[in-house]
């Protein structure tokens, strides 16, 4: 079990598991800190020498707080990128998967499903797939279906001006207005 406490913006981790002892690759059912020569730092729970359970991972301005399974982000978690973008939601084997919210540093936001199970970075967000809502920083909003990161299927685009485009979308273009 993991208990997390945020004090002055810093995450403090506490676990009911005992402190890890001995060689790293033997750590199991324990809580510890692992730092690499490349600057990676993980504070959390371990099983068979792997990140497993609740943990906090940091590296070069990036931070993940959440669940791990067999050394991969898996379950609920929050990943903050060094550019200020943030993903909050479900993970499966190190990838966005299931329900989640991606908040861009410019204020844009996508809330919805992530299905394709590919690794994502702020430059490669092709995973919006299924039903979702994308709110632009200027107030425009699209609510509808997505495929491979593009508006695709039934959807409504509402502009801040009040103009509405509704109908069937294909590859980000309205093809059958309602």
Regions found by a protein language model. Give the residues of each.
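Glycine/tyrosine- and acidic-biased, solvent-exposed loop/turn segments at the edges of beta-strands
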Residues: 6-178
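Sec-dependent signal peptide recognition
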Residues: 1-3
């Amino acid at each position: 079990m993991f208990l997390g406490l945020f004090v002055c913006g810093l995450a403090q981790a506490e676990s009911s598991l005992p402190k890890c002892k001995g060689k790293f690759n033997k750590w199991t059912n324990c809580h510890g800190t692992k730092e690499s020569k490349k600057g990676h730092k993980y504070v959390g729970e371990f099983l068979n020498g792997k990140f497993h359970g609740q943990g906090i991972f940091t590296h070069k301005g990036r931070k993940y707080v959440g669940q791990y399974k067999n050394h991969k982000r898996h379950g609920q978690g929050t990943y903050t990128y060094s550019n200020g973008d943030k993903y909050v939601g479900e993970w499966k084997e190190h990838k966005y998967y299931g329900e989640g919210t991606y908040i861009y540093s410019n204020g844009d936001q996508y809330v919805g499903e992530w299905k394709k199970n590919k690794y994502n970075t702020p430059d490669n967000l092709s995973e919006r797939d299924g039903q979702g809502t994308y709110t632009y920083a200027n107030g425009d909003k699209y609510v509808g279906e997505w495929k491979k990161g593009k508006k695709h299927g039934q959807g409504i685009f509402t502009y801040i001006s009040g103009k509405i485009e509704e109908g069937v979308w294909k590859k980000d273009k309205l093809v059958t207005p309602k």
